A protein has these predicted regions:
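Alpha-helical transmembrane segments in inner-membrane proteins
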Residues: 1-318
């Protein structure tokens, strides 16, 4: 009873903080125009979607890899998504010259990325057996390679075309990709249901691979399905607001600090609430305190990067 009461108090506190962050974000409510209401409502929805996608995908990925320092973003999935998007847009503008369809492009990119990373699953499992420093070096090198190729292709483009492509290439919290908001919401909602149903499987995988196999779990099959879902969640979040290297890492590790529990349903809910509060409250402070002179992604990357090195230092000291 004390265990349940503790989590109930935690949920109530996080929900109150989330409501407070929303009220601060919409304040003053009576002075907002219809356009401002619509824009802020869309942003609130996107903040919730990003918190859901990032929190669930990162915690699930860390369970699969048995490593709390690795995230889909650090492995370069976001950078690879940007590279695919750049290649697709360059190919369309140079060869096909068709009218742009953001939804079709988004679906094609999701399909390509899913197929690519599922094909590399065998190599990924081999990589996870290596030393953490080696893994990080490989991942940083791959991420840098993907970003440099993307930049090189963009430099070769006509300046006018390049300017037109910026909105679709690099979304942000200030400039949301609302053209795919509806389909992105459906994908994230469907995958959220999928991961909550797989939460018990993740609880078993948390006991490590050998134990899961002894308990009769088809580890290979479950890992493939979960990895596919993680790639889709990460890609959808990247398409909505752009790449955020350390947001998932920050969410997951703050959740582990807040909740001393292995059950993934509980971890998912706390991570979603923490992510939503962080994004909403952070954006409200940036608009009111910093007068939009900085971006929320800068704060997220700074805090997340600092937390990453602190935890890495603490691990090295053990």
């Amino acid at each position: 009873m004390q265990f349940k009461s503790k989590h109930t108090k935690l949920f109530c506190l996080l929900i109150i903080l989330a409501i407070g962050a929303c009220l601060l974000y919409f304040w003053p409510i009576t002075h907002l125009s219809a356009f401002a209401w619509k824009l802020r409502s869309q942003k609130i929805i996107v903040y919730l979607l990003v918190a859901i996608a990032t929190g669930i995908s990162t915690i699930s990925f860390q369970t699969l890899t048995e490593n709390r320092f690795l995230t889909p973003s650090i492995l370069g999935i976001e950078s690879f998504y940007v590279l695919l998007q750049t290649l697709l847009l360059v190919f369309e503008s140079k060869f096909l010259q068709l009218e742009k369809s953001p939804i079709l492009e988004f679906l094609v990119l999701l399909l390509l990325q899913s197929l690519f990373f599922l094909a590399l699953q065998g190599y990924l499992k081999t990589l996870m057996k290596q030393d953490l420093v080696f893994i990080l070096l490989i991942c940083l090198a791959l991420g840098s390679l993907f970003r440099n190729i993307s930049t090189f292709l963009q430099v070769l483009m006509d300046p006018n075309e390049y300017d037109k492509l910026q909105n679709s290439l690099f979304a942000s919290f200030q400039h949301l990709n609302t053209s795919i908001l509806a389909i992105g919401s459906l994908i994230i909602l469907a995958l959220t249901i999928f991961f909550f149903r797989k939460a018990v499987i993740l609880d078993v995988l948390h006991l490590q691979r050998e134990t899961a196999q002894i308990l009769g779990l088809d580890v290979e099959k479950e890992q493939k399905e979960l990895l596919w879902g993680i790639v889709l969640l990460t890609s959808t979040a990247t398409a909505l607001v752009g790449p955020m290297a350390f947001f998932g890492f920050m969410l997951a590790n703050l959740t582990y600090l807040i909740v001393k529990d292995y059950r993934h349903k509980l971890l998912f809910v706390v991570a979603i609430l923490v992510g939503f509060i962080s994004l909403t409250l952070g954006q409200a402070l940036i608009e009111r305190v910093f007068a939009l002179e900085i971006r929320i992604s800068m704060i997220i990357e700074s805090v997340g990067g600092l937390l990453f090195f602190i935890l890495l230092y603490r691990r090295a000291r053990r």
